[in-house]
Curated annotation (Swiss-Prot):
CDD domains named among the record's database cross-references: TMP_TenI
Main function: Condenses 4-methyl-5-(beta-hydroxyethyl)thiazole monophosphate (THZ-P) and 2-methyl-4-amino-5-hydroxymethyl pyrimidine pyrophosphate (HMP-PP) to form thiamine monophosphate (TMP).
Protein name as annotated: Thiamine-phosphate synthase
Cofactor annotation comment: Binds 1 Mg(2+) ion per subunit.
Residues the record lists as binding 2-[(2R,5Z)-2-carboxy-4-methylthiazol-5(2H)-ylidene]ethyl phosphate: 134-136, 166, 186-187
Catalytic activity entry: 2-[(2R,5Z)-2-carboxy-4-methylthiazol-5(2H)-ylidene]ethyl phosphate + 4-amino-2-methyl-5-(diphosphooxymethyl)pyrimidine + 2 H(+) = thiamine phosphate + CO2 + diphosphate; 2-(2-carboxy-4-methylthiazol-5-yl)ethyl phosphate + 4-amino-2-methyl-5-(diphosphooxymethyl)pyrimidine + 2 H(+) = thiamine phosphate + CO2 + diphosphate; 4-methyl-5-(2-phosphooxyethyl)-thiazole + 4-amino-2-methyl-5-(diphosphooxymethyl)pyrimidine + H(+) = thiamine phosphate + diphosphate
Family as reported in the entry's similarity comment: Belongs to the thiamine-phosphate synthase family.
Cofactor entry: Mg(2+)
SUPFAM superfamilies from the UniProt entry: Thiamin phosphate synthase
HAMAP family for this protein: TMP_synthase
Enzyme class name: transferase
GO (cellular component) term, any one: cytoplasm
Pathway: Cofactor biosynthesis; thiamine diphosphate biosynthesis; thiamine phosphate from 4-amino-2-methyl-5-diphosphomethylpyrimidine and 4-methyl-5-(2-phosphoethyl)-thiazole: step 1/1
Length: 211
């Protein structure tokens, strides 16, 4: 059995939106989401610090699991619930500092080799993707598909996992059927014609996560 060294998270984190603004954080927490990630890319720390402070405050207000993507120093400074890192960030991040601060850690993976690298860090959860084609960001690898996702889930057993990449409202049930603990979504909410309805439907499917 794999065991995280970082503080644990529930196996089921529920619906896990990944958004790029405090406005979306507030909207979705108000709508009932309880696991969420702020992902702001390619800005200096001083440009994003105010947004990170505001997002963390919202997370506390709603008793939510708020992860900060990449900006681990600011996440430590302002005591976020957790940090999410890509593979490319692992070598340049002080993982011991994150752990010492008591923050949870999530790590992205795209194949078996990256899963091995992630497991060596013993994070709180492992993200598996991208499951389907996605327009949200440039991806260096091909989509995994459901069969490969299910294979990863079988390997990781009861380790907390999050599926990400091209997961729509229609695809969400088949993704969860693989046994993955949680689903991360981006455009399924932020580009929906009615984001409130989309969020409510996805919450019905994926839930808010375990306590």
């Amino acid at each position: 059995m794999y065991q995280p060294d970082f503080p644990t998270v529930p196996f089921r984190l529920g619906l896990y939106p990944v958004v790029d603004s405090v406005q979306w954080i507030e909207r979705l927490l108000e709508a009932g989401v309880r696991t969420i990630q702020l992902r702001i890319k390619d800005k200096r720390d001083e440009e994003v610090e105010a947004d990170i402070i505001a997002a963390i405050a919202l997370g506390r207000r709603y008793d939510a699991r708020l992860f900060i993507n990449d900006y681990w120093r600011l996440a430590i400074k302002h005591r976020a619930y957790g940090v999410h890192l890509g593979q490319e960030d692992l070598e340049t991040t002080d993982l011991e500092a994150i752990q010492a601060a008591g923050l949870r850690l999530g790590v992205s993976t795209h194949d078996d080799m990256e899963i091995d690298i992630a497991l060596a860090a013993k994070p709180s959860y492992i993200a598996l993707g991208h499951v389907f084609p996605t327009q949200t960001k440039q991806m260096p690898s091909a989509p995994q598909g459901l069969a490969q996702l299910a294979s990863h889930i079988e390997r990781l057993a009861d380790y907390p996992t999050v599926a990400i990449g091209g997961i729509s409202l229609e695809r969400a049930p088949s993704v969860l059927a693989t046994g993955v603990g949680s689903i991360a979504v981006v455009s399924a909410i932020t580009q929906a014609a009615d984001w409130r309805a989309a969020t409510a439907q996805l919450l019905d499917i994926a839930g808010v996560g375990d306590e």
